[in-house]
C-alpha cells in the first residue's frame, strides 16, 4: 500500500481502520493486542517516511508488527493470522519480501540493523535501516552490545524506541517537551555539531566547564545514556501524533548517523477496555470485543498453574526457596510468588543470561533457586547453564514451561530443543512429569535435589489426568505403567506418556507402557531388563528427534528395535496445536497407524 501522498488526516483515518482490522481479527484468532494497537502510528509513519521496497524494516520481537503486515499486501490474508497455513504473528521473509528478517525472540533488532548497515556501506547503496524496538527489549544485554558498536562506527541507522510502559524516565514537564522538539530540529542538530567542533579547540579548563554545562543540560532529558554511547537521541515525543512522528523521522533519516527516537505510546490504544492494562492484554486468546471477556474457557488446570501453586506452597513453608523469571511473571506462574515473597522471587526483565547465572550463588549459599522459563527462551541462557551452573555443580532447578508444540506463536516459540541441548551437559539431570500430580512431585524432587536439574511440562494442560497412580520421583528411576504379554513397548517421556496412552487405545495388539521419567540419568537396570522382554520399542516425546529421548536409548546399545515419534529435523510451523500435530502425523489415530506398519 503506497501512502506517500496521504495527508495527515488520511493517515489518521487509515490508522483507525488498521486498529479496527487488528481488533476484529485478534478477537477471533487470538494474538498480541495491546502493544500492536499502540504501535500503529509508529508503523504508519515508518512507511510514510522510509521506502519499504529498499530500506530494511526491522521489528524487534515483531509481535507489534501487525500494522506493517496490513500495509504490505496482507489485508485480506490477515483473517488467517496465526492459523495453520495462514500468515504468521511475527515477521517472516518467506511470507513477504517486505519482512526483512525472522523475529520472535527479543532484543535482536539493533544487531540486525548494524549488520544491514555494514552490508549497505560495503555495497555503497543509498538505504537506511529502520528499527522498531520496545522499551522492554532494552533490558537485554545484546541491545547494548549492538549500541556499543553502532555508536563507535556511526552507521546511519534510525531506531524508534517504543516506550509503552513508561519504564524509561518520563519527560520532565515543559522544559523536556521543549528540548525534545528543539533536539529534533535542523537548527539544534547544526548547533550541536558546531559546538562539538568548538569544544575541540578550547583550552582544557574551558573545555571542562563547557562539557559540564553540556552534561547538566543532558541530565534533564532521558537520552544521556544513548548520547554517551555516541548515538543521537531525540525525544520523548508523542508516539500517536503522526505529524510529529513524520517530521522527526524525516529529520532522523537525513542525519546520516545513528539516532534513537524515543516515542511514548499507550498500550491498547483505541480499545478502551485494554488501554492501560499492560500485561493482561499483551497476548490474548479469542475474546468478546464488547466486553473483553475470553471466549475460551479451560476445563482442565494448566501445567503452569499447577507448578505455580506447588512452588507457592513450598515457598510458604521453606524460606530457602527462591526463584527468578525473565520478563514472564504471568506466563511462568511466578507472579503470585513475586507479589507475596518479593524478597525471594524476582523478575529480572528480558535478561535470560543474567537470570540463570544469578541463581548460582544463591544455591551455593544454601538456598534452593528455581529458574522458571520457557523452553524456547532458555536457549538464550545456554552458555550460562553450562559455565555458571553445571560446571559449578550447584543445585539450581530449571522449570521448563512451554515444552513441546506451543501452537500459534510458531517456529520461534516451539519448545522442541531443550532435551537435545541440555542432555549433553555434564552434571545435568533431566526428568519430566506426565500429569498434574507428578508435576507436583517434580517440583518437590527439584526442591530437595542439590545438583543441577531441569524438568519440562507443556503449555496448557497435560494429556493425562489421573489415569495412573502417581508416585514421587526417584533419581534415575523409570516406571512401568502397563505390562502386557506382547513384545511391543511404548516408551513415553513427559507429556509423551499421555500421547502413548491415547495411541494404545487405537491398537488391538497387546502393548506395554513405560514412563521413562528420567532421560538423564536413565534407569539402565530396568531398561536392560525390559529389552529382554520387549522386541520393539516406540518412543513418544514432545521433543526433537536429533539428540532426543530415542538417541539416549540408542546409546545404551540394547538388543531392541527402536522407532521414535519425536519431532523431525525441521522448524515447526504455527497454528492450533491440534492442526500442527495433525500435519506432523502426531495425532493418536495417525500414530497408531504408523505403529501398525511396524508390528
Curated annotation (Swiss-Prot):
Protein origin, superkingdom: Bacteria
Entry binding sites for Mg(2+): 135, 164
Assigned EC number: 2.2.1.7
Any GO molecular function: magnesium ion binding
Cofactor descriptive note: Binds 1 Mg(2+) ion per subunit.
PROSITE patterns per the UniProt record, alphabetical: TRANSKETOLASE_1 (PS00801), TRANSKETOLASE_2 (PS00802)
One Pfam assignment: DXP_synthase_N
Keywords: Isoprene biosynthesis, Magnesium, Metal-binding, Thiamine biosynthesis, Thiamine pyrophosphate, Transferase
Catalyzed reactions: D-glyceraldehyde 3-phosphate + pyruvate + H(+) = 1-deoxy-D-xylulose 5-phosphate + CO2
Biological or metabolic pathway of the protein: Metabolic intermediate biosynthesis; 1-deoxy-D-xylulose 5-phosphate biosynthesis; 1-deoxy-D-xylulose 5-phosphate from D-glyceraldehyde 3-phosphate and pyruvate: step 1/1
Cofactor requirements of the protein: Mg(2+); thiamine diphosphate
GO cellular component terms attached to this protein's record: cytosol
GO biological process, one term: thiamine biosynthetic process
Binding site for thiamine diphosphate: 63, 104-106, 136-137, 164, 271, 352
Assembly notes: Homodimer.
Family: Belongs to the transketolase family. DXPS subfamily.
Function: Catalyzes the acyloin condensation reaction between C atoms 2 and 3 of pyruvate and glyceraldehyde 3-phosphate to yield 1-deoxy-D-xylulose-5-phosphate (DXP).
PANTHER family from the UniProt entry: 1-D-DEOXYXYLULOSE 5-PHOSPHATE SYNTHASE-RELATED (PTHR43322), 1-DEOXY-D-XYLULOSE-5-PHOSPHATE SYNTHASE, CHLOROPLASTIC (PTHR43322:SF5)
Listed name of the protein: 1-deoxy-D-xylulose-5-phosphate synthase
Species annotation: Nitratiruptor sp. (strain SB155-2)
Lineage, opening ranks: Bacteria, Pseudomonadati, Campylobacterota, Epsilonproteobacteria, Nautiliales
Gene giving rise to this polypeptide: dxs
